[in-house]
């Protein structure tokens, strides 16, 4: 079996799945206190890196995703599957877990 090299461009989400690059979490508080990894909040904002073809409807047609590559989005805190690629954090989630497009 050949080894597969995973990069953002080789990840092709299926159905209504969206692949998001997670924004970096805050390293310190507003008062200047450095936060250890265990105290950092899980980020809920990221940039859309890849978009699936859309949800398949009962009649066989596809529902076009409402987000596009490059959109900044706010998503549910515990949604999706966390993935690490090339030192960056990503999350693969269903479009229904995206709450809003921001910025």
Swiss-Prot record:
GO molecular function list: ATP binding; metal ion binding; protein folding chaperone; protein-folding chaperone binding; unfolded protein binding
Q: Where in the cell is it found?
A: Cytoplasm
Q: Which UniProt keywords apply?
A: Chaperone, Cytoplasm
Instruction: Kindly give the InterPro entries that the UniProt entry links to this protein.
Output: Chaperonin_GroES, Chaperonin_GroES_sf, Chaprnonin_Cpn10_CS, GroES-like_sf
The family database entries (SMART domains) matched by this protein are listed as: Cpn10
Q: Tell me yes or no: is Flavoprotein among this UniProt entry's keywords.
A: no
What's this protein's family per the entry?
Answer: Belongs to the GroES chaperonin family.
The entry's protein name is: Co-chaperonin GroES
Q: Which organism is it from?
A: Prochlorococcus marinus (strain MIT 9312)
